[in-house]
């Protein structure tokens, strides 16, 4: 039944390609629409994959990504409100030496691997056209392209924040639209060879600083800095930045030799819904965008894709077509509350470390030290980070 049905995925970034690849096994015809495929899709970021996310991707045929990822065995949290300290306040680790807390992979590597697989599939089509309009037909969504060609689809998936204008007719509702008044600066440190299997989060007074281990000689940095912070001076000059990291973190990296290009991103907490969700779904940052403090953004997107697969299998077993009202409702019921609760939890963690009161900071630091001794609570945190929240 499915081989006569069509899905349109709008957006050819990592989210769009991942959806297309994971849905390709359903014998659906899938069009990936992008206005400009020639535009370079270079993403400088490294992605944190939970063990659960990576295991699922491997199960769907992306087995090579495990070899191309760097394993995380430890996660250290440092409350550095008063000053930068390398002594951790909270430590997460794996009990089994063969296991991992998470994995770090280059987003371009993952993108290239999925793209190559898609190019070899006969039910995947890349359309390099601009969309003029999207309208309802009796049993389809009708997409009209700028060249006036029309195509009907059982389901339309928005997978790129570049297509917000097309969503206006679907009555996009911003459930949450909050600015953190800070920017994330993303870059890589190239350093001497070390045993690099620990991720670290330093909660500085003006924003969190995260280290993600990429290889024995490379570490990815995500530094969130308040708009009015004095720390902006460091990221504006590589010479100052290199000196800053060598002064404060030499014990971790021996010597930092160089720093890559610095990329800047505005940080927001966004949670969107469609009032008119007939045969239409959203994935990725166009649906929900969270603070990178816990490295959970991409895992959240993957969990949503896996939920869609589960719902499609359910509809297939009942003989229902893709995009029907039951599928849309069941998917939204499975994901919306979980996503909102999880995103709110991440936002709450950011708030906890955003309070600039000395007495509060003292209590917070003591609380982290006490949590470090509670293995039950720590294991629950690890499980939530690995598999998400399911309510």
For the regions a language model picked out, list residue spans one by one.
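Conserved FAD-binding catalytic core of PHBH/FMO-like flavoproteins
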Residues: 152, 159-253, 262
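Glycine-rich FAD pyrophosphate-binding loop
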Residues: 10, 24-45
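Beta1/beta-strand and adjacent pyrophosphate-binding region of the FAD-binding site
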Residues: 1-13
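C-terminal helical "tail/cap" subdomain of flavin- and related membrane-associated enzymes
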Residues: 310-391
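N-terminal Rossmann-fold NAD(P) dinucleotide-binding loop
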Residues: 16-17
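Conserved N-terminal helical subregion
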Residues: 2, 55-59, 70-169, 178-182
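N-terminal glycine-rich dinucleotide-binding loop that anchors FAD/FMN and/or NAD(P) in oxidoreductases
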Residues: 45-69
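FAD/FMN-dependent oxidoreductases across multiple families
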Residues: 231-316, 323-326
